[in-house]
Regions:
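Phosphate/oxyanion-binding loops and surfaces in catalytic or ligand/nucleic-acid-binding neighborhoods
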Residues: 105, 300-301
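ABC transporter nucleotide-binding domain
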Residues: 172-260
């Protein structure tokens, strides 16, 4: 039984003197949606290209379905569907005709076209020219093409990039259905934390070519321990009073932040500040977002 659909060891890719991916240890379980998260230029697409055999690693090993890609490349790739960057299609052919081209090349059953059109919800527009499709419909056509061979692993590189909110929602809901309804494992990359949060069951965060976090999405959410937000008339004096009691407090955007939020602690801190002549006008428990966790993990100050 395959423990991991994707398993890499010390996966590294250099372009000249520049290291794009460094020592990557990716582990993707069967039947999961693995969200591969990182800012543009972090190494996501380079990693995906290595997994698909499009470029060779500088060093390291790649196992897909328990097999070494160097020894069983063609056998492995038959079990993978992919959409890397933008979809490829013939604009002067209909959506159905585009899939017919793929069906003939791969010698697939004719019925498969109708099946994938239904999966990606393009059945009603299947006979329109592909060049007349919206960007979201073109993305779904690209996913349909990737699904033609009934892959065990579907690899999608930034599938929601450039889409409007409605298009993003359509792609997200489509991806979420694939493991349960069709038994697929999905690797989806994105620079949008909110997208990964809403559809992934596993997450890997890559930064400057290095995987800095990898676990179930729930483990990432467990890091969302709430903080106590304090607003006071003399914020610097309040900070000094709290620090003198040996507590770690952070001043940010005119408010103090403390990691302890128990009712007893909040009451005690409020009493200490008031007795010291500090007028407290805000005591608020704030749950940290996943973006806050990302910034903490990466040590960056900006958003994805």
């Amino acid at each position: 039984m395959e423990q991991h659909i994707v398993l890499t060891k010390n996966l590294t890719k250099k372009f000249g003197k520049q290291t794009s991916v460094s020592g990557l240890e990716m582990k993707i379980k069967k039947g999961q949606i693995y969200g591969f998260l990182g800012p543009n230029g972090a190494g996501k697409t380079t990693t995906i290209r290595m997994l698909l055999g499009l470029i060779k690693p500088t060093k390291g090993d790649i196992q897909l379905f328990g097999q070494d890609i160097r020894k069983h490349r063609l056998q492995i790739l038959r079990r993978i569907g992919s959409l890397v960057e933008s979809p490829s299609y013939y604009g002067n052919l209909t959506g159905r005709e585009n899939l017919e081209v793929i069906r003939r090349v791969r010698d697939l059953p004719e019925a498969r076209i109708a099946e994938v059109l239904e999966i990606v919800r393009l059945s009603k527009v299947a006979d329109r020219l592909a060049k007349e499709y919206s960007l979201g419909m073109k993305q779904r056509l690209g996913i349909a093409a990737a699904l033609m061979s009934k892959p065990d692993l579907l690899v999608l590189d930034e599938p929601t990039n450039g889409l409007d909110p409605a298009g993003i929602h359509e792609i997200r809901e489509l991806i979420k259905e694939l493991p349960d309804q069709y038994g697929m494992t999905v690797l989806v990359s994105s620079h949008l934390l909110s997208e990964i949060d809403q559809m992934a069951t596993q997450v890997g965060i890559i930064m400057n070519g290095k995987l800095i976090f990898q676990d179930d999405i729930e483990e990432l959410r467990k890091k969302q321990k709430p903080l106590l937000k304090i607003g006071a008339n003399n914020i610097h004096e309040a900070q000094s009073i709290i620090q003198k009691r040996g507590l770690h407090v952070k001043l940010q955007e005119g408010n103090l932040w403390i990691s302890e939020t128990s009712p007893e602690f909040v009451s005690e801190i409020n009493g200490i500040l008031v007795q010291s002549g500090v007028s407290v006008y805000r005591l608020e428990e704030v749950k940290r977002s996943l973006e806050d966790i990302f910034l903490e993990l990466t040590g960056t100050e900006g958003s994805l």
